[in-house]
Amino acid sequence: MTSPRFSLVPAAYLLLLREHGNRTEVLLQLRQNTGYMDGYWACGVAGHVEPGESVLVTASREAEEELGLHVAPEALVPLTAMHRSNDVGGAALEQRVDFFFSARHWEGEPRVQEKTKNADLQWFALDSLPMRVPPHERAVLGWLRTQLAGGAPVPPVVVFGFDGEVGCGDG
């Protein structure tokens, strides 16, 4: 009997950040009609890496497709790489490697481009996120909030969802 091979799915996430008063805010989209985490406030820009594409190009392309923004690859600040397992239950036939970036500079005004997939777009203070944020994204946003407050830096590599544990590799 042969066991099925699992897939490794790479994705790029881009956290768009701005200062509002004395707080750092992140842009989140309300997911709908996707079959995954619908009703959750998720990263404003995220998507799978296409064949032959780097994660930097993916993040820039997704910013244009999802929000109508031009974000130059050189404006992307690497945050962390996350290796994660199935986070919705059932057999884990795939694993994911998510590359998280942030940016504070872009061209254009963010607007929902994919209205069938995203119901709303809002800025949230990092210390006042909505209740429903995908768990792996909430973890990264929490580490970022700690770093920006002068605490420990975001770990460069993390694992998430393996037997319900989060682990960090920070040297």
Q: What do these predicted ranges mean?
A:
Residues M1-L27, H48-V49, A81, S102:
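Conserved N-terminal beta-strand and adjoining loop/helix that marks the start
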Residues L8, M37, L93-V97:
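Residue-level preference for beta-strand/loop junctions
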Residues N22-R31, E109-Q113, P155-F160:
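Short, well-ordered strand-loop elements centered on a beta-strand within folded domains, enriched
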Residues R23-E66:
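Conserved Nudix-box catalytic region and its N-terminal flanking loop in Nudix hydrolases
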Residues M37-G39, V45, P78, K117, ...:
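Glycine-rich, flexible loop/turn motifs
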Residues G39, G44, A125, Q147-A149:
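Residue-level detector of functionally special positions within alpha-helical transmembrane segments
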Residues H48-E74, T80-A139:
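Unchanged
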Residues W143-G171:
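Charged phosphate-binding loop/patch that engages nucleotide di/tri-phosphates or the phosphate backbone
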